[in-house]
Amino acid sequence: MTIAIGQEKTRGGFDLVDDWLKRDRFVFVGWSGLLLFPCAYLAVGGWLTGTTFVTSWYTHGLASSYLEGCNFLTAAVSTPANSMGHSLLFLWGPEAQGDFTRWCQIGGLWAFIALHGSFGLIGFCLRQFEIARLVGLRPYNAIAFSGPIAVFVSVFLMYPLGQASWFFAPSLGVAAIFRFLLFLQGFHNWTLNPFHMMGVAGILGGALLCAIHGATVQNTLFEDGDAADTFRAFTPTQSEETYSMVTANRFWSQIFGVAFSNKRWLHFFMLFVPVTGLWTSAFGIVGLALNLRAYDFVSQELRAAEDPEFETFYTKIILXDEGIRSWMAAQDQPHENFIFPEEVLPRGNAL
């Protein structure tokens, strides 16, 4: 008989921390939580602080806080002043020099929230990877969440990095985002951009697929219990299906002539459509950061300029964009002292 005497492996500090982070608790922490929770807390806290107390008078010439009379829809944390360029605006940096009030006045809170928000979203994505790995799931949730991350990073970081300063990013508020949308339309003709079209198709297509899928499952639920309502007619741990894929397939085959043949392809398509839409719109925003143009139908513009009776929906959009630029540039960038002579302002359909 052979007796093997082994020495118990000593556990290092890393193993102890790993065990504590992955302990089963009400709110899982994990290694990703070390990035997610502090960044999310600071980003949300910074936004609540900014919308409550901090003015945009010094950066945009606007009132933007509850303290100044704004409400939830009009309050915002505004982007830094154009003169700040692409500085990270550290509180201890040369701009604020440790003065918290000055830091808020020049837009330091926006940079603080945008950067911590970006890392918070990345932390949330990593959290989905980590938990999926621990419980033995595929990582498609995390892959899908890369879409919102791509849009956030492209809009709040990549776009202003391609422009003159952080000033041209969206301020963090509801009405502020609407103003940014008008800006993108007026200066980039964004709605006519094919990447925007693909993004809209992806998001609205995903919503349509979600509605169809939910309704179809509800329509084909089995009556496999004696409970009073549908939701109590099955148990979450039962091995049998609770709805009929065959019935759903026959129904949509009659409606459209085609239908998904299996659940894997169906659910992959529901994943693919909206995530692809988000990614394509993010690519489009990066293109706008580089001032790339899309779909300039110059022949129609030239003919409209020569013939007062010729007008298309495209030339009407171009006129509207000119109006947005001429009104918004002076309003939105008062520090530039823009003055537009009468002859460059849009009039009729004469471009």
Swiss-Prot record:
Provide the reaction this enzyme catalyses. 2 a plastoquinone + 4 hnu + 2 H2O = 2 a plastoquinol + O2
- The enzyme class is oxidoreductase
Which keywords belong to this entry? Chlorophyll, Chloroplast, Chromophore, Electron transport, Iron, Magnesium, Membrane, Metal-binding, Oxidoreductase, Photosynthesis, Photosystem II, Plastid, Thylakoid, Transmembrane, Transmembrane helix, Transport
GO-annotated cellular components: chloroplast thylakoid membrane; photosystem II
Cofactor binding note from Swiss-Prot or TrEMBL? The D1/D2 heterodimer binds P680, chlorophylls that are the primary electron donor of PSII, and subsequent electron acceptors. It shares a non-heme iron and each subunit binds pheophytin, quinone, additional chlorophylls, carotenoids and lipids. There is also a Cl(-1) ion associated with D1 and D2, which is required for oxygen evolution. The PSII complex binds additional chlorophylls, carotenoids and specific lipids.
Q: How does it sit in the membrane?
A: Multi-pass membrane protein
Q: Which GO terms describe its molecular function?
A: chlorophyll binding; electron transporter, transferring electrons within the cyclic electron transport pathway of photosynthesis activity; iron ion binding; oxidoreductase activity
- Bilayer-crossing residues are 39-59, 123-139, 151-164, 206-226, 277-293
UniProt EC number:
1.10.3.9
NCBIfam families recorded = psbD (TIGR01152)
Q: Could you describe the subunit structure of this protein?
A: PSII is composed of 1 copy each of membrane proteins PsbA, PsbB, PsbC, PsbD, PsbE, PsbF, PsbH, PsbI, PsbJ, PsbK, PsbL, PsbM, PsbT, PsbX, PsbY, PsbZ, Psb30/Ycf12, at least 3 peripheral proteins of the oxygen-evolving complex and a large number of cofactors. It forms dimeric complexes.
State what protein this is by name.
Photosystem II D2 protein
Q: What is the lineage of its organism?
A: Eukaryota, Rhodophyta, Bangiophyceae, Bangiales, Bangiaceae
